[in-house]
């Protein structure tokens, strides 16, 4: 079973009963759970607080779970996100996965299935803790994640709403902190820490 004791989980659902059940289940395992009745409240917290896993319902008043997922990925590209869909709602599940969700969970929630998916998602956030241990900032981790997706400095700057010069500065500091001198070694170092699979040589050659 995963170690929940250091995990910070954000859970979004407009049904108070569901929020209570989920928060109690995860808190009994040691996780620190923050619950939100509206997606926009969660998004505000994401911009200023650490989150290791985001779990959100899809159909809610105001901002939907898919919209929250999209915005959350802009704030924290590395963040694993799980979405909760109605039973048999395949089109919605597909939309969520295309938007960047790691997995989906169907209602009504089955405890065994729910915890299995949550544990798998938390394993994805473990490399981030290791990178934070290397004193990387959240912005540097976001830049690194996008770099490992094959994004150029210009694309990263646009996605993170920063100047190209700022992104270049983040990349230089990240390389220095991880003890590497080029992009190829940076990718290898990140992979060794468990952040990502190594991209293809063609991807590395196109980095600018």
Regions flagged by a language model, labelled:
Residues 60:
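Receiver (REC) domain active-site loop signature in two-component systems and cognate sites
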Residues 35-53, 74:
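Acidic, metal-coordinating helix/loop segments flanking the phosphotransfer/catalytic sites
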Residues 89-91, 105-118, 159:
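C-terminal output helix
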Residues 175-208:
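Basic, Lys/Arg-enriched C-terminal extension of HTH/homeodomain DNA-binding domains
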Residues 37-38, 64-67:
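Acidic catalytic/metal-coordinating carboxylates
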Residues 3-18, 22-26, 54:
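Conserved acidic segment of CheY-like receiver
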């Amino acid at each position: 079973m995963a170690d929940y004791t250091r995990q910070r989980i954000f859970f979004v659902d407009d049904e108070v009963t569901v929020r209570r059940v989920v928060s109690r289940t995860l808190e009994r395992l040691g996780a620190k759970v923050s619950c939100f009745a509206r997606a926009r409240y969660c998004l505000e917290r994401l911009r200023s607080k650490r989150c290791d896993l985001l779990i959100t319902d899809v159909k809610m008043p105001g901002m939907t779970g898919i919209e929250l997922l999209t915005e959350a990925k802009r704030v924290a590209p590395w963040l694993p996100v799980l979405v909760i869909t109605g039973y048999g709602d395949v089109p919605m599940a597909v939309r969520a996965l295309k938007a960047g969700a790691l997995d989906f969970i169907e209602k009504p929630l089955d405890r065994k299935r729910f915890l299995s998916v949550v544990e798998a998602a938390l394993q994805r956030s473990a490399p981030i803790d290791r990178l934070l241990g290397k004193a990387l900032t959240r912005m540097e981790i976001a830049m690194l994640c996008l770099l490992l997706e094959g994004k150029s400095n210009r694309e990263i700057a646009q996605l993170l709403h920063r100047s190209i010069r700022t992104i270049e500065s983040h990349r230089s500091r990240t390389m220095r902190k991880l003890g590497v001198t080029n992009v190829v070694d940076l990718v290898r170092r990140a992979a060794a820490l468990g952040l990502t699979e190594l991209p293809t040589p063609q991807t590395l050659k196109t980095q600018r």
